[in-house]
């Protein structure tokens, strides 16, 4: 800031000195003589700034407003800042130059928003100087430029503390006593969410949606789970919380309501209960769907130590030698041949394969119609009559009587065995007739794979009745040298084969009905083709 020492202020600048003394004629002569109007001293102060700062008054000096007006008319820049960042407008507000000087500066382009190095603008300095005229001109200038001015002043209350007041279109801050103190620290479990139901009144306040409960939340969760229409998962969780032991709640830690170990134990109990419930449901379903069966002599019927017993049908077909039979009948015939030994119990699997041939006969063996009525009795007679077993089959247990065997032979199994044994007498002199299907072969039936022996489960099929001769000679176990019959071999490929028995000759002449567990589409087509050939 300049002082009264003109020599120090002007630094030999005649223009600044003439302005400082308020000599209008001298200033005009200097400017007309070529002096630079925006020239500054070592502090960066220009002639316009000096005119706003000076307070020198004598008989030859003029007023500040006239000097400022003359300098502005000669294109003095009002927005030049000195080294401290202050403009001529800021200096006029600090020195309280008056409203007229401020108005002249604003009319000639002075910017009231420019700030100095401390971040204060002309508005701040006008407020601090308590110059109401200058402040009024500044506010009018800001509004004219479309700027909204907010003035913030500090005041001291009666207690000596500073308070803040706001003006100009800004709502005042609420008083301290009007502010609601925040509620006590609450955990998420303390907050009860209520949905507006259909039966609730329309005049219910919004404050009721979120309510804080002062007591322990775990003690009332059971009642909330019963009353509110929440989701099933939420009800289960609330009931689980109700069953847990009450823990002491700390004032400093409102969130630790339940220990993790208690939650883990409760979760394990719920899982065990859920698993037991599932087991009960499965057990009840199994009791309804699956009837109990009689006792079996061997429980693990599929446990075989010989892995070679289970061959696929394709492997068996590849082992059959080539014969003179036609290709179409031969492939299906070779696929359907297999030996079937007598089994002592249902649920057992033969270990060795039976090797026996087919006796000679003609196509006239299929002449008599079959009947479903006598099949069950025939199978029962086969099981109870004593006689030698096939060479490589499992023998009957000697300790079991006829009544025990009757229990083990159910009606739905006898239908299948009767239909299979009734076809053992169909002749074939082809060299491939010496090999028949082993009992352990698997065949696709319906939607699953079943064993083609007495452990397989059968249902009455829908095959048309065929004519069968029930009095053929005993099958010869040696290979036959007679020429093969294409018709008989074709019949064997389309009809399932039953296990052979040496007691077949002693059976009474009865009508047999050929049955199959289930039929595939290809086999049904072959049967229809065979019926056309027979007709």
From Swiss-Prot:
The modification Phosphoserine is found at residues 301, 447. Pfam families: Ank_2. The keyword Metal-binding does not apply. One of its GO terms (cellular component) is pi-body. It comes from the Eukaryota. SUPFAM superfamilies: Ankyrin repeat. ANK repeats lie at residues 10-39, 43-80, 84-114, 118-147. Residues 216-225 have a biased composition (Polar residues). This is Ankyrin repeat domain-containing protein 34C. It comes from Homo sapiens (Human). The gene is ANKRD34C.
